[in-house]
A protein has these predicted regions:
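Conserved catalytic cysteine-centered active-site region
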Residues: 39-65, 96-129
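Beta-strand segments within the central parallel beta-sheet cores of soluble alpha/beta enzyme folds
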Residues: 5, 46, 85-93, 126-129
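Generic secondary-structure signature for well-ordered alpha-helical cores
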Residues: 10, 51, 77-81, 91, ...
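Short glycine-rich, polar/acidic loop-and-turn segments at beta strand-coil junctions
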Residues: 61, 72, 90-95
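N-terminal amphipathic/basic leader segments beginning at the initiator methionine
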Residues: 1-41
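Aromatic/hydrophobic pocket-lining residues that form the small-molecule binding cavity
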Residues: 68
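Phosphate/pyrophosphate-binding loops at sites that engage ATP/ADP/AMP, CoA/4′-phosphopantetheine
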Residues: 71-87
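Surface-exposed, flexible loop/turn segments at secondary-structure boundaries
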Residues: 13, 94-97
Length: 129
Protein backbone atom coordinates (compact mmCIF):
# COMPACT_ATOMS: atom_id res chain seq x y z
CA UNK A 1 0.00 0.00 0.00
CA UNK A 2 1.37 3.39 -0.99
CA UNK A 3 0.39 6.38 1.08
CA UNK A 4 1.17 9.99 0.32
CA UNK A 5 -0.16 13.38 1.26
CA UNK A 6 -0.88 15.42 -1.86
CA UNK A 7 -2.71 18.37 -0.35
CA UNK A 8 -3.32 20.14 2.91
CA UNK A 9 -5.98 22.43 4.26
CA UNK A 10 -6.64 24.48 7.34
CA UNK A 11 -9.15 26.77 8.97
CA UNK A 12 -8.15 29.90 10.84
CA UNK A 13 -11.00 31.44 12.85
CA UNK A 14 -11.82 35.07 12.08
CA UNK A 15 -12.37 36.29 15.64
CA UNK A 16 -9.08 37.79 16.87
CA UNK A 17 -8.36 38.44 20.54
CA UNK A 18 -5.09 40.26 21.17
CA UNK A 19 -3.19 40.61 24.42
CA UNK A 20 -4.43 44.20 24.55
CA UNK A 21 -7.98 42.86 24.88
CA UNK A 22 -7.02 41.46 28.30
CA UNK A 23 -6.25 44.87 29.80
CA UNK A 24 -9.84 45.02 31.05
CA UNK A 25 -9.56 41.66 32.83
CA UNK A 26 -8.73 40.98 36.44
CA UNK A 27 -6.26 38.14 36.97
CA UNK A 28 -6.70 36.05 40.11
CA UNK A 29 -4.67 33.68 42.25
CA UNK A 30 -5.88 30.13 42.80
CA UNK A 31 -7.65 31.27 45.98
CA UNK A 32 -9.58 33.96 44.08
CA UNK A 33 -7.60 36.95 45.33
CA UNK A 34 -6.32 39.45 42.73
CA UNK A 35 -2.71 39.11 41.59
CA UNK A 36 -0.48 41.85 42.97
CA UNK A 37 1.08 42.80 39.62
CA UNK A 38 -0.66 45.14 37.20
CA UNK A 39 -2.55 43.67 34.27
CA UNK A 40 0.02 45.22 31.92
CA UNK A 41 2.87 43.39 33.71
CA UNK A 42 0.97 40.08 33.70
CA UNK A 43 0.19 40.33 29.99
CA UNK A 44 3.82 41.26 29.27
CA UNK A 45 5.08 38.22 31.21
CA UNK A 46 2.61 35.97 29.43
CA UNK A 47 3.87 37.21 26.05
CA UNK A 48 7.54 36.86 27.03
CA UNK A 49 7.00 33.28 28.25
CA UNK A 50 4.72 32.01 25.47
CA UNK A 51 5.34 34.37 22.55
CA UNK A 52 1.57 34.61 22.09
CA UNK A 53 0.32 38.03 20.99
CA UNK A 54 -3.10 37.04 19.68
CA UNK A 55 -5.36 34.06 19.64
CA UNK A 56 -8.27 33.09 17.39
CA UNK A 57 -11.73 31.96 18.41
CA UNK A 58 -14.21 30.09 16.25
CA UNK A 59 -17.70 31.49 15.87
CA UNK A 60 -19.97 30.01 18.55
CA UNK A 61 -22.18 28.42 15.87
CA UNK A 62 -19.32 26.31 14.48
CA UNK A 63 -18.77 22.76 15.70
CA UNK A 64 -15.53 20.81 15.58
CA UNK A 65 -16.87 18.81 12.62
CA UNK A 66 -17.71 22.07 10.78
CA UNK A 67 -14.17 23.36 11.27
CA UNK A 68 -12.68 20.01 10.20
CA UNK A 69 -14.92 19.93 7.11
CA UNK A 70 -13.79 23.43 6.09
CA UNK A 71 -10.14 22.37 6.44
CA UNK A 72 -10.81 19.13 4.55
CA UNK A 73 -12.55 21.03 1.73
CA UNK A 74 -9.49 23.28 1.49
CA UNK A 75 -7.24 20.19 1.34
CA UNK A 76 -9.34 18.72 -1.49
CA UNK A 77 -9.05 21.98 -3.42
CA UNK A 78 -5.29 22.14 -2.73
CA UNK A 79 -4.80 18.55 -3.93
CA UNK A 80 -6.95 19.11 -7.03
CA UNK A 81 -8.71 15.77 -6.59
CA UNK A 82 -12.22 14.41 -6.86
CA UNK A 83 -13.53 13.99 -3.31
CA UNK A 84 -14.98 10.60 -4.31
CA UNK A 85 -11.43 9.28 -4.84
CA UNK A 86 -10.51 9.68 -1.16
CA UNK A 87 -9.77 6.33 0.52
CA UNK A 88 -9.72 7.40 4.16
CA UNK A 89 -10.73 10.29 6.35
CA UNK A 90 -8.68 10.23 9.53
CA UNK A 91 -9.60 12.77 12.17
CA UNK A 92 -7.40 12.69 15.27
CA UNK A 93 -9.60 13.92 18.08
CA UNK A 94 -10.73 12.45 21.39
CA UNK A 95 -13.98 14.35 21.76
CA UNK A 96 -17.07 14.90 19.64
CA UNK A 97 -18.99 18.00 18.70
CA UNK A 98 -19.93 20.25 21.63
CA UNK A 99 -22.51 22.95 20.99
CA UNK A 100 -21.85 26.42 22.40
CA UNK A 101 -23.14 26.73 25.95
CA UNK A 102 -23.35 22.96 26.46
CA UNK A 103 -21.06 20.64 28.39
CA UNK A 104 -22.17 17.33 26.87
CA UNK A 105 -20.23 16.07 23.85
CA UNK A 106 -22.06 14.49 20.92
CA UNK A 107 -19.70 11.63 20.06
CA UNK A 108 -21.78 9.44 17.73
CA UNK A 109 -21.36 9.31 14.83
CA UNK A 110 -17.63 9.96 14.85
CA UNK A 111 -16.27 13.33 13.79
CA UNK A 112 -14.65 11.76 10.71
CA UNK A 113 -18.04 10.33 9.70
CA UNK A 114 -19.64 13.76 10.12
CA UNK A 115 -16.90 15.32 7.99
CA UNK A 116 -17.47 12.72 5.26
CA UNK A 117 -21.16 13.63 5.29
CA UNK A 118 -20.46 17.39 5.25
CA UNK A 119 -18.13 16.88 2.29
CA UNK A 120 -20.99 15.04 0.53
CA UNK A 121 -18.79 12.01 -0.16
CA UNK A 122 -20.96 9.10 -1.34
CA UNK A 123 -18.17 6.56 -1.97
CA UNK A 124 -18.80 3.65 0.46
CA UNK A 125 -15.13 2.64 0.15
CA UNK A 126 -14.05 5.94 1.73
CA UNK A 127 -13.58 4.88 5.34
CA UNK A 128 -13.95 7.51 8.06
CA UNK A 129 -11.85 6.94 11.20
Amino acid sequence: MNIKIIGSGSYIPEIKVTNQDFHKHMFLNEDGTPLTHSTEVIIGKFKSITGIEERRYADENLLTSDIAAIAAENAIIDAKIDRESIDYIILAHNFGDVKHGKIQADTVPSLATRVKNKLRIKNPKCVAY
